[in-house]
Curated annotation (Swiss-Prot):
Pfam families found in the cross-reference section: PRDM2_PR (PF21549)
Homology family: Belongs to the class V-like SAM-binding methyltransferase superfamily.
Protein name as catalogued: PR domain-containing protein 11
InterPro entries xrefs: PRDM11_PR/SET, SET_dom, SET_dom_sf, Zinc_finger
Cross-link Glycyl lysine isopeptide (Lys-Gly) (interchain with G-Cter in SUMO2): where in chain: 54, 121, 138, 166, 180
Keyword annotations from UniProtKB, A to Z: Cytoplasm, Isopeptide bond, Methyltransferase, Nucleus, Phosphoprotein, S-adenosyl-L-methionine, Transcription, Transcription regulation, Transferase, Ubl conjugation
Gene Ontology biological process: methylation; negative regulation of cell growth; negative regulation of DNA-templated transcription; positive regulation of DNA-templated transcription; positive regulation of fibroblast apoptotic process; regulation of cell cycle; regulation of MAPK cascade
UniProt source species: Mus musculus (Mouse)
Observed effect of gene inactivation: Mutant mice are born in expected Mendelian ratios and exhibit no apparent phenotype. Mutant embryonic fibroblasts show an increased oncogenic transformation capacity.
Molecular function, one GO term: chromatin binding
Length: 565
């Protein structure tokens, strides 16, 4: 009796007394034998394990305890049974010995080939092993695989075979060095099951190749992994994964606890937001501006741009306070329903900027009225900007703040309200009271178009402006504002040849208020008056608001839509 058998019996008596495990095997199915010619090995099935008390069976049965799972078995290809020392019917396993060659000799791996086989090297440098003159019987064992044993991460990979040691850890036998390896390194892995004739398995931390069928002369050797070898590696992989996961979770919890102890202030206190530069927002917009579904024009203005317009009007007090500061400006979020007295003060006191200068001029009276705002506590959402223009114009269109901070929003809101009132009158059929005052020209030097081409082309608005207004815009100079020039003729007179007066010549005659309202070109003038504010000088939020107002204007004239940049 061998040492392994004695050790197995000792563990049996110490662990479970007279209770022993009887191992039986199950042969391969006849269909598999017919398909591949000769049967290959089959691993022990759990259903074949039976427990019988107080008796030790004969030589056909293997006696092992349940707790003793590290016993390695040999497999008999003829009986399709596992055994420890020898098969009850066919005796001990048959080994094919290598040709003895000292370690360190060049090309040692090819010289260790057993008799009856040879290593064939192709012209491309690839090597292969084949049987030459004798049939290799089924069940013969080649090996062990020789090479340098190392951990898994140090293995070469292609010529390495994984093994599981006694401590259930991975190791590899690296056969990349031809001076230390043997001929088994040249055996090619089979590409499909029908061409395989060898099965690789592990026994006592060594790798062996077993012939699963007869190998005839001229046939090349092809090896594949045995079923028990693959299951062993798979079970070890699962255990390693679970162990690493449990270990990683414990380490993560420990690191979090240590971090919480080192930085207790992270668990409480307000969140510090990053400081903005150049008026850019670090947060992306959560919606695409072009994906808004078209709705009723009035409802669109009320629901979508109401808060924007209110915030634009109320932001005047914040801007006035910013203009009074000499250092970098701090723009704060203004409450939604705050009183707009400071916005009116900023509008009436004439906050302006010289076109050639970068400094903003604010009268002292306005700065004194805005004094109490400086004592207010700054909100955490405040951010810094270098100038009001950079706060609105330098930012990316896709990274806009939720409200507008451009200095023109107050005047834009006032104009929007006036236009909405006029449109309501047009819609209801009421006539406005004739104005006794001469028309006022809204001077907006910062909205000037030096070339005049952009404004004149945009005022056409896809043909919605009457021909008389179109003539004014094309022939007139950029210094004249469309706010002060109503159309010279009725729409039915705009098609005549002499219907286009010149802005550069004599003054354009005025029309009566009734004629103004009846003129279908009135909607074009309204669009032109409002679109002057959009010549690349206002913030994109205001531009979207004006776009909706223009849609409302066009709806009165036939359902056309506004196309703004």
């Amino acid at each position: 009796m061998t040492e392994n058998m004695k050790e197995c019996l000792a563990h049996t008596k110490a662990a479970v007394g007279d209770m022993v495990t009887v191992v039986k095997t199950e042969v391969c199915s006849p269909l598999r034998d017919q398909e591949y010619g000769q049967p290959c090995s089959r691993r022990l099935e759990p259903s074949s394990m039976e427990v019988e008390p107080k008796k030790l069976k004969g030589k056909r049965d293997l006696i092992v305890t349940k707790s003793f799972q590290q016993v390695d078995f040999w497999f008999c290809e003829s009986c399709q049974e596992y055994f420890v020392d020898e098969c009850p019917n066919h005796g001990p396993p048959v080994f094919v010995s290598d040709t003895p060659v000292p370690v360190g000799i060049p090309d040692r791996a090819a010289l260790t080939i057993p008799q009856g086989m040879e290593v064939v090297k192709d012209a491309g440098g690839e090597s292969d092993v084949r049987c030459i003159n004798e049939v290799i019987p089924k069940g013969h064992i080649f090996g062990p695989y020789e090479g340098q044993i190392s951990t898994q991460d140090k293995s070469a990979g292609f010529f390495s075979w994984l093994i599981v040691d006694k401590n259930n850890r991975y190791k590899s036998i690296d056969g990349s060095d031809e001076t230390k390896a043997n001929w088994m390194r040249y055996v090619v892995i089979s590409r499909e099951e029908r061409e395989q004739n060898l099965l690789a398995f592990q026994h006592s931390e060594r790798i062996y190749f077993r012939a699963c069928r007869d190998i005839r002369p001229g046939e090349r050797l092809r090896v594949w992994y045995s079923e028990d070898y693959m299951k062993r590696l798979h079970s070890m992989s699962q255990e390693t994964i679970h162990r690493n996961l449990a270990r990683g979770e414990k380490r993560l919890q420990r690191e979090k606890a240590e971090q919480a102890l080192e930085n207790p202030e992270d668990l409480r206190g307000p969140t510090q937001f990053p400081v903005l530069k150049q008026g850019r927002s670090p947060y992306k917009r959560s919606f695409d501006e072009g994906d808004i579904h078209p709705q009723a024009k009035k409802k669109k203005i009320d629901l979508i741009f109401k808060d924007v317009l209110e915030a634009s009007l109320e932001s005047g007090n914040v801007e006035a306070r910013q203009l009074a500061l000499s250092t970098s400006l701090v723009i704060r979020k203004v409450p939604k329903y705050q009183d707009d007295d400071y916005g009116r003060a900023a509008l009436t006191q004439g906050i302006c900027r010289t076109p050639g200068e970068g400094d903003w001029k604010v009268p002292q009276r306005v700065a004194k009225e805005l004094g109490p705002l400086e004592d207010e506590e700054e909100e955490p959402t405040s951010f810094k900007a270098d100038s009001p223009a950079e706060a609105s114009l330098a930012s990316d269109p896709h990274e806009l703040p939720t409200t507008s901070f451009c200095p023109n929003c107050i005047r834009l809101k006032k104009k929007v309200r006036e236009l909405q009132a006029e449109l309501d009158m047009l819609k209801s059929g009421k006539l406005p009271e004739p104005s006794l005052l001469p028309p006022q020209v809204l001077e907006l030097p910062e909205f000037s178009d030096p070339a005049g081409k952009f404004l004149r082309m945009r005022l056409l608005l896809k043909g919605r402006v009457c021909s008389a207004t179109r003539a004014h815009c094309v022939e007139g100079g950029p210094e004249r504002s469309a706010l002060s020039q109503p159309p010279a003729r009725r729409p039915e007179e705009c098609n005549s040849a002499e219907a286009a007066p010149s802005w550069g010549g004599s003054p354009v005659p005025q029309v009566t208020e009734a004629g103004w309202l009846e003129d279908r070109g009135r909607e074009g003038i309204a669009c032109a008056n409002l679109y002057i504010l959009l010549v690349n000088k206002i913030c994109p939020i205001c531009r979207r608001a004006v776009c909706c107002v223009l849609d409302l204007v066009f709806s009165l004239g036939g359902g056309a839509h506004c196309c703004l940049p």
